[in-house]
Amino acid sequence: MKNIVLIGSGNLAEALARAISRTEGATLLQIFARNAKRGTALALENGTAWSSDPRELAAADLYILAVSDAAITTLAESLPIPAEAAVV
């Protein structure tokens, strides 16, 4: 089973959250997003947790960055993602 954290709350994140939620063997542990309104709505829709606080980032096997191209590098470097986790 893959435990997944989805980072972002835009259109791409919405589509990915729906797909992950329907995928057998995958568990969407958390939506991590700076936009509280969209982040909480996306989390509620998919039955998962939401946070915007890096200290609350869930431990997962896979972290999916569904954010703007401009934000990817800075965000990936600033979040406490475990070294053994996969990031896409």
Feature annotation, model-predicted:
Residues 1-51:
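NAD(P)+-binding Rossmann beta1-loop-alpha1 motif at the extreme N-terminus of oxidoreductases
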Residues 46-88:
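Rossmann-like NAD(P)(H) cofactor-binding subdomain of soluble oxidoreductases
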